[in-house]
Amino acid sequence: SVERLCRQIRANGAAPVLFATWAYQKGGTKLTDKGWDYDERARALSEAYHKAAQENNALIADVGQRFYKWSDPQALYAADGIHPSELGSRIAAETIAAAIQAHKENEL
C-alpha cells in the first residue's frame, strides 16, 4: 500500500514522492475500448494521487497534469497510446526533479 511504502521510505531517511501518472492517450484505442472519457480519467487519476499524497504526507510529481495541460499531448505518448514518448519521458523526469528540488528548497 502507499502508506506502507511511504513508511518504509521515511524509515530509510528519504521523502516519498508519488509519481502521478497520466490517462491513456486521448482518442486512443486503449481508452475508447474501455469506454472511458479522457477528461474524466485524467481528473480521477489526479484526484486519487493527490488524495494519497495528502493522506501519507508525501510529495507528488504530477506528471499526469503536465500531460493533460500540454498544448500537443499526442506528442507525449508512444505509439501504443499508454507509455510516454521520448518527449513524454523528458517531461516526466523534469516534473519529478522539480518536485524533489522544491522539497529540498523548503527544507532549507
Segments the model singles out, each with a brief description of its role:
Residues 1-108:
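Alpha-helical cap/lid subdomain in secreted, periplasmic
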